[in-house]
Amino acid sequence: MLNELRLFEREVRFYKEVAPLIELSTPRCYYGATDGEAGDHVLLLEDLAPARVGDNVAGCSNEDAELGIREIAKFHAAFWESPRLTGLDWISSFDHTAELMQGLYRQQLEPFLAKVQDVLPSTLLEIAQRFSGNVAAIMIQLSGSPRTINHGDYRLDNMIFGTPEKGPLLTVLDWQVPMIGPGVADVAYFVAFCIDPERRRATESGLLRTYYSVLVECGVSGYDFDDCMRDYRVSMLYHLTRVVVAAGLLDFSDERGQRLVRAMLERLDSAFTDHNLIELMPG
């Protein structure tokens, strides 16, 4: 399945074609190659020790959240409605993958529910079942917003934190699922999945204002804050797709995997409830 989705090919191409163009710190790539037909892939990246690795289970501090939002905003601004996007046709877009994700969601919903039935909040269960017929419509809706490159899996487990004495302050890895779509989709994913509910409620508004302000400072125009907030809420609903498909396909049966799933479901449930996301679904 992973070969069919071309995840490894995309990551190798990202390090070769996109990483040299950006200011956002990524691990230095010493070698990368892929053979799609044989299913063989290799990527040799620099060792970032002794930098601190983010931990999705533990959750995000205010300082790390602020840094993560500022850095991804600058990355998004660099490709905002850029002509360079047309040359990156190997990166999937929201509209072109809408039907694929619709099918994957329906295919993986039952395996997902079977794995998490003991820890899935009832509100999230209802939304997950109702969302089964709405994935493509939500993704097509998001494709109408200004486009940039999304990381696609922007969360603490994919972040390495340095110090002022031994920088960079943030290095981002795991570029297997970049997407072309609304940048704030990365923000919705990060805030919903990485920040515990109480902390999110206290910091969410400020983080979104920070994200929008950095976009504007970097030259983004024609995108007002109300549009950003609308896309944020819709993107958060879309990310239920990511949870269902990933949990359905992958093995989270070890101790940390189980803790990760519980933490992410708890955070997602609170975010969905606070933002009343069920009202966004057609029908």
Pin down the residues of each PLM region.
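Active-site catalytic-loop/activation-segment of kinase and kinase-like phosphoryl-transfer enzymes
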Residues: 77, 87-138, 241-244
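Conserved ATP-binding subdomain of kinase catalytic cores across diverse folds
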Residues: 1-104, 183-184, 199, 221, ...
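Short, flexible loop/turn elements at secondary-structure junctions
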Residues: 33-36, 47-49, 154, 163, ...
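All-alpha amphipathic helical-bundle segments outside canonical DNA-binding/catalytic cores
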Residues: 220-236, 268
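ATP/Mg2+ or Mg2+-diphosphate-binding catalytic cores
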Residues: 234-283
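Active-site acidic catalytic loop and adjacent metal/ATP-binding pocket
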Residues: 134-183
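Active-site activation/catalytic loop segments of kinase-like enzymes and analogous catalytic loops
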Residues: 13, 177-220, 236-256
